[in-house]
Regions:
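C-terminal motif of bacterial Sec signal peptides marking the signal peptidase cleavage site
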Residues: 21-24
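Von Willebrand factor
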Residues: 31-141, 143-145, 178-181, 214-218
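Bacterial signal peptide processing site
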Residues: 26-28
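Bacterial N-terminal signal peptides that target proteins for export
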Residues: 2-14
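Exposed acidic/Ser/Thr-rich ligand/metal-binding surfaces
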Residues: 33, 117-167
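VWA/integrin I-like adhesion module and closely mimicked acidic/polar interface patches used
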Residues: 151-196
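Von Willebrand factor A/integrin I-like adhesion domains
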Residues: 186-221
Length: 221
């Protein structure tokens, strides 16, 4: 092989290596996190809303620059961006991200102070809105946190049955799932309610769990 041919072959190998490196970089999975927290404001559960602030502050403390978060209410009709109380994607600069977190916490605190009970509970609509948000952000890790008793109660005219819910790559965590008065008479209602939501999430390809002890959030995020 002549010196010219050897040099040309070496250049081709360098070009191939560069192309492969670029392809590898382009297909890398994002490492950031997206969190969507749903807060049930319906009926008597509205009295629990103050506890949600603890969860939100914990989430803010765990999230890093380039992570995204949104907090939205569950009420009569939850499949709408109007239900989003606050949302943010944190700046790469830590000082700016901390300013964003403080502003976010302030908006949440205002919501908690002013919230009023909703007559109905559209959990499925809230989940659909959450999935839209997380899909748009396209983060590497996706979490939906639901602060609710998980009892769906739809107003007349709201259709939510058999809606396709794609939970692939999403962790869904139900928090502070309080027991209804009827659950005390028949605990099977509580257990079957949670089992139905677990089945819906897992059938959609997601992962489901329940955390009722708000003092043990170490495994969250």
């Amino acid at each position: 092989m002549t010196r010219a041919n050897s040099l040309a072959s070496h250049c081709r190998w360098l070009m191939l290596a560069a192309v492969l490196a670029l392809g590898s970089c382009g297909s890398a999975t994002p490492r950031n996190t997206g969190v969507y927290l749903l807060v049930d404001t319906s009926g008597t559960y509205n009295k629990q809303v103050g506890k949600a602030e603890q969860i939100i502050r914990y989430a803010l403390s765990r999230l890093q620059p380039a992570d995204s978060i949104a907090v939205a209410r569950i009420d009569t009709g939850s499949f709408t961006e109007k239900n989003i109380i606050a949302k943010a994607t944190f700046d790469e600069r830590p000082s700016t991200a901390n300013q964003q977190k403080r502003a976010f916490a302030g908006r949440v605190e205002k919501f908690i102070d002013e919230t009023t009970p909703a007559p109905y509970t559209d959990i499925t609509g809230g989940l659909l809105q959450a999935l839209e948000f997380l899909k748009e952000k396209d983060t590497g890790r996706k979490e939906i946190l639901i602060f609710s008793d998980m009892k769906e109660d739809l107003a007349k005219g709201y259709v939510r049955a058999e809606l396709p819910l794609d939970f692939r790559g999403v962790d869904v965590v139900a928090l502070n799932v309080t027991k209804l008065r009827s659950d005390n008479f028949d605990p099977r209602e509580y257990l079957s309610r949670l089992d139905a939501w677990r089945a819906k999430v897992e059938q959609g390809g997601g992962h489901w769990r329940v955390i009722n002890d708000l003092d043990r959030l170490d495994g969250l995020l």
